[in-house]
Curated annotation (Swiss-Prot):
Top-level class of the enzyme under EC nomenclature: transferase
An MF annotation (GO) of this entry: S-adenosylmethionine:tRNA ribosyltransferase-isomerase activity
Lineage: Bacteria, Pseudomonadati, Pseudomonadota, Gammaproteobacteria, Lysobacterales
SUBUNIT field: Monomer.
Protein name: S-adenosylmethionine:tRNA ribosyltransferase-isomerase
EC number(s) from the headed UniProt entry: 2.4.99.17
InterPro entries: QueA, QueA_dom1, QueA_dom2, QueA_sf
Gene for this chain: queA
Amino acid sequence: MLKKSDFHYDLPEELIAQGPLPERSASRLMLVPSAPEQFQDCYVRDLPELLQPGDLLVFNDTRVIPARLFGRKVSGGRVEVLIERFLGTHQAVVQLRTSRSLKVGNRILLDAGGHAEVLGRDGEFYLLSFDVESPLEQWLSDVGQLPLPPYIHREPDEYDRERYQTVFARAVGAVAAPTAGLHFDESLLARLRARGVEFGYITLHVGAGTFQPVRVALLQEHVMHSEWFKVGAELVEQVRSARARGGRVIAVGTTVVRSLESAMRHGELQPFVGETQIFIFPGYCIRSVDAMVTNFHLPESTLLMLVAAFAGRTRILDAYYHAVQQRYRFFSYGDAMLLFPRNAGEQ
């Protein structure tokens, strides 16, 4: 049985990117072909030369909301609120950071004005009702703070409002960015189109659960967080057309892989809207994509386990060792990989 510790690697703290590069597509890109071919050190801007006419790039078009709020309990204790998802115009599922748990009926006096009341609790999530001056989504866009990942040790600024968002973000609802998509700027997209590469989109609203660690030793005992996603009929037809013409389906990010795999029915991609708790780790066979662009992920994380299922655990850990030796930048604002699948029988 696979253990969490099977996905450990040593990462120097200074390789964790604390902010974006001035140019999105200037990030480095490690090409990881199927074994035994060697890794290649490239740049994201090289993608038009690495892809082929007829390939289909699939992006996640979710848009990050400024989902972080601050307030205090009636008793005076400080509270941090992180919106997980909206339920109507004035209710939301949230995570709370506070010295003591809140109970049903407790109020939070919000620094930005108004208050929220606890309606219920399910594990680490709370249901809050917000008494604020406008619909919650609109109000947050004015007063909320962008929820940068916990390994970025600084407060967000106005630059993050632009750069912790993809250039094609349109479907509001994520509390974390689909980070592989952050590398694509308009210039790179234009060059890819000129190359004959097509674009398709899914929506998966990345939740705060993406940062939750695996807390059990054996992977089979881990319960994955739930996220809302949509795979539309238009994308399904694009995938079928790409396959028919001999093109490759290339996922931009692990969220795209999770969405496509969750929408597979009897070996075929089907339109789907709903929740997914799919947990992909080695032993699972990913059939929906032929390659993937992805950032470098945290040790022992479910995202690292997903890419290991695709490219092979040994291959991925070797690639990460190479990335550390070559001083790649890691995590959300870091560099990327272009991964191809493991060979049959490869671990």
